[in-house]
Amino acid sequence: MPELLAHYPFTDTAYHELLDRQGGVRPHWQRLFRQLERSSPEQLRQRQALVERQIQENGVTYNVYADPKGTDRPWALDLLPNLLSAAEWQPIAAGVAQRARLLNALLADLYGDQRLLAEGLLPSELVFGHPNFLWPALGIRPPGGIFLHSYAVDLARDADGRWQVLADRTQAPSGAGYALENRQIVSRALPELYRDLRVQHLAGYFRTLQETLASQAAGDGETPLVVLLTPGRFNETYFEHLYLARQLGFPLVEGHDLTVRDATLYLKTLGGLKRVHAVLRRLDDDFCDPLELRTDSALGIPGLLEAVRQGRVLVANALGSGVLESPGLLGFLPQACRRLLGEELALPSLDTRWCGEPQALEAILAALPDLVIKPAFPGQRCEPLFGHALDSAGLASLGERLRERPQAYVAQRLAQLSQAPVWRDGEAGVGLQSRAIGMRVFAVAASDGRYWVMPGGLTRVASAADAEVVSMQRGGASKDTWVLAERAVGGEPLRPRRLGVRDLVREDPYLPSRVVENLFWCGRYAERCDDHARLLRVVLSRYVDADGDEEALRSALALAGGIGLLPGDGEPLERRLLRALLDEHWPASLCANLRRLHWAAAQVRGRLSGENWLALLELQRDMQALDPARTDLGEALDFLNRLVMSLAALSGFALDDMTRDDGWRFLMIGRRIERVRFFAESIAAFLDGGSAWDAGALEWLLELGNSGITYRSRYLASPQLVPVLDLLLLHEQNPHSLRFQLQALERSLERLHEEFGAPRERELRTLGERLRSFDLAALESPLFGAAGLDEVLVGLARLLRDIAACAGQVSDRLGLRYFAHVDDVSQRTVST
């Protein structure tokens, strides 16, 4: 690849990670640079494609709040890692470890004796005015005195190559999981380079976190249960929560999965309440307990703070640690370090001054064009303001705001970010380009209180060459961060503890009720989408067929309208059919049900295989690609054909890929309940519709029941009522028959009775027995002629409607007993 640096922008106003001041390649970058020179654009293009394919296959995503379509956006990762030599890394690691010790000691002081406040080393307005200073947490001392179990710091390198701290992340630091995922992807894309450069491993960080939480948890002699608390799937880093939970072996839970009883935290599982000993939270401080903190929080656990206060549960990081994330504190840390640790602060902060100091305010106002103004506290609706970007009127207005509320703002010198090479292949050309970067470094507390720094981190890349801010929310990308060792590094994967026969686990002991509930509804919505797609396909195929059977179309439309699948009669039929498919505001539309399926599946993404999740995403994309205003019936019919095949693949994933545990059982129960309800209602409506003896109508009924091929192969005749009803209602070997589904549902419910002591569903069993005892011969020789025949069909339709209603009642009782944990007596109270 000749002239690799011919178009690489090189300036002396910023530090270049790749190049020294003379434009030469730095020593620790030379091995990577030589490989780039030997590689053709096509080879690098293939490696970048491998990175992107791995991201897609692994489902690595990041939610961008500002983008309405930003949910589950693919993670952006550059092919080229950011390299740091061992000599460069050592002072960084030492400085980060010292800073973690300092901030831990600072939290102990703020929620303890408050010596720094009493001595005037910290302004009380910065502490007590911070919304994340939690007065209810005052006096709480966590086990071992560890407030910060994990810590992250955002670093940038100035033009002279010196590292400076931009921000401290103390309450729920994110990014470590993404750093590990980046490592696994890039090391596969550049395997020879990764081996030859002797890159230090990241696994020690995660192993230390596991060990610390387990050792510090309030166990009372029990094996500690540690959970990872997430705000849910709409959090920007939800993928990381899933990924960390899998890597660490912690159940991923949301606030309503947990409950506090007698100052003890419990996980609500299918088998009852299980005590939780430690919580690794990804939830901000004030959302954690609506009882004592933010009362409008729907994400936290009422009573959690009291459980912490009583020493019954460990929360990492300690509640209230978010107070240290105020940028206003940065300027006071050097003197705090001397007072608390007796040391000089090794890693300096970016020059930052709090506007609440009168002397500082005057100096800030005089230098506004050269500064960046930021809010002093989180929650203020104010983006950073760059003084150099404001005109004289804007500067005057900003000055007035600072004078009115000086304590609400801080001023920082504009950070001069270092530049790193990125691989670009686009309209601007192929080759190396330069982008501003920042680096987030992570530290974890060991059980003895010392901090271990991850040798690497998350390098974030600006979205454009002229970007002044590095932010994933603003479209930025990431890099893997390689810290090079001076000698060969031994293999160090994430080594789990050695497991023996005594450790074997056949069932998930910590399956949250919420997970089971969402799997149950995954099953119901998947089956509902399949049923509705098949019925719409029946109607559309006969509607677009100019030479079709009018009676078959009439009966199919009557059925679709009778069970509520079609909107009202006030519109043309073609419009009603398209609305039934594509109108997301019509509750019974296929589009609305696919959206519900995606929602339920997203809640249990960690329980689904990668292939299963990708198939669900593909379903959603296919539906979104259809424009309701432009789609015609032919396109709609083609989509329905593809949709039925995709839903069949989803069903296959459930049958072949999932472990037959309680979660799978409830998924299948959900499918069977939905199938029984739909098919019983549909055949009842068909029998009442007056077309029971019409061959064309019976043909589409077989198609709806996915049994047309079976019928033709057995009877070699046009459809007739008696054999059709036998195949669809009574055939015990046809997996699509009502009898087969009822028996499978009864077996699953009996299993719940045996495992959990649930009351038997006697009414459903009785109705199933009545169906199985139905004599089809009554349709051949009725006692009272045609009137008797009609009475038989009416009675059968009534029985089918009773079965459908009973299946719905079974669903309600399952929800009360297993998802809401309402006991049997309370269920009877609710039902009356």
Model feature map: region roles:
Residues 214, 218, 249, 284, ...:
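Hydrophobic alpha-helix feature that most strongly marks membrane-spanning transmembrane helices
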Residues 2-27, 149-151, 157-164, 168-314, ...:
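ATP-binding N-terminal substructure of ATP-dependent carboxylate-amine bond-forming enzymes
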Residues 153, 168-169, 231-232, 282-283, ...:
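Fold-independent oxyanion-binding glycine-rich loops
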Residues 169-170, 232, 271, 319, ...:
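A broadly conserved detector of short glycine/acidic/proline-rich loop/turn motifs that flank catalytic sites
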Residues 89-110, 123, 129-133, 245, ...:
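Active-site nucleotide/adenylate-binding loops and adjacent lid/helix of ATP-dependent enzymes
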Residues 2-87, 91:
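N-terminal low-complexity, Ser/Thr- and acidic-residue-enriched intrinsically disordered segments
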Residues 128, 132-164, 278, 353-369, ...:
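Phosphate-binding site of ATP-dependent enzymes
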Residues 57-147, 158-160, 170-226, 234-243, ...:
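Alpha-helical transmembrane segments and their helix-helix packing motifs
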